[in-house]
Amino acid sequence: MDDRRAIPIRFGEFVALSAAMMSTQAIAIDAMLPAFPAIVGALKVGNPNHGQWIVTAYMAGLGSGQLVWGVLSDRFGRRPIVLGGIALYVVAALVCGLTKSFEALLAWRFVHGLAAASATVVRSMVRDLYSGRQMARVLSLTFVVFLMVPVLAPSLGQAILWLGSWRYIFIACGVFASIVWCWAFLRLPETLHPEYRLTLDPVHIFRAARLVVLNRISMFYTLAMTVLFGSLIAYVGMVQQIFADVFHRPGIMPGMFALCAGFMGVAAFTNSRLVERLGMRLISHSAILVFIAISALHAAIAALGWEHMWTFVLLQAATMATFSLSVSNFGAMAMEPVGAVAGIGASLQGCISTGAAAVVGAVIGRDFNGSTLPLATGSLWCGLIALGFVLAAERGRLFQQQHAGAG
């Protein structure tokens, strides 16, 4: 389906606004990365590794909140849910900036993530309007714009730290979300057709969720996304410690993080240009195999003690590029069979992929030992497990051709 003419917003602005709403999720993580040592010191946290909990608490809220927002968006429409969620996000960000204890910060970071989860409704909006390879193209273009945040946010966070307190980073997140809220309030259309609105009847919700869970393609591609997201969360949680404790160059972390994110952006843009011609399966299946190969090479280099800052950056950038090519298409393929219940479908998939990924990332992150080996081996295992889920989805055969509109 392609209903571009049915909504009072141009295609380019819809992509940009969708990316801006999704970016509220990322900026709350990426802008905080340079501030971990300052927060740990200011709030008197004993174990420096516990700074990663700032990400973990947020991701836990992000995962659990998606199910709630998705169900509500299927009942009340996409627009009011997105606007309400962003408003709560602004409040949570400001309160995080005022907290006096680490425990209170973690509690409000959970709320912060809970509110940020409303932006996942954007995937439902895209599914309302597009399907198949067109949907994959729109999601890839959205991802390209969205990736400007991890490119710029760490440098923004570092600049704020140079000028003042880490608390101002949370305030900056709130200001950014306020601007996005105003844009959405003025321009965001309602994409859910009235006849597709569902009741809040628990039986109906259960049936819709059952449709998602029991669909082989939807569920196994969701699980493949989950473990790959886990490797990304581990990287985000560990990157500041890696540059500080392994390479002793904490000051260049924002720039190197931006470089890796830039590779993700290039990959997402490339996907948007090629996916309608080559198909989601050819691109994503090739990408996951390359992801595994790069992770294996990285793990070997780290195990042999040959790791250098530039080997880490280049291999991690390549890993992130293949991650982008894999996940953007996995997400589109997971959504394709559940268009009739897109809100519940996107929220359930997001709840599983984000919530479980936070656990995977925490498990990898807790093993940080002053080297890059835990991250490299963790990424390798995540890639292998993701490949297993892809094989389960495709009944053991990669690169299967689908009709042009679907895969």
At which residue positions do the language-model features occur?
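Conserved MFS/SLC helix-loop-helix module at the cytosolic interface between two early adjacent transmembrane helices
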Residues: G63-E103
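Juxtamembrane intracellular "pre-TM" segments in multi-pass secondary transporters
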Residues: D2-P8, P189-Y221
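Structural signature of the two symmetry-related core transmembrane helices
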Residues: P80-V95, G174, I283-H298
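Extracellular/periplasmic helix-loop-helix junction of adjacent transmembrane segments
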Residues: A35-S64
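C-terminal transmembrane helical hairpin of 12-TM major facilitator-type secondary transporters
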Residues: L282-N329
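Cytoplasmic helix-loop-helix junction between adjacent transmembrane helices
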Residues: W108-F146
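Helix-loop-helix hairpin linking two adjacent transmembrane segments in secondary transporters
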Residues: A104, G132-R133, R137-L186
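Helix-breaking motifs and short loop linkers at transmembrane-helix boundaries and internal kinks
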Residues: V45, G77, L98-E103, A115, ...
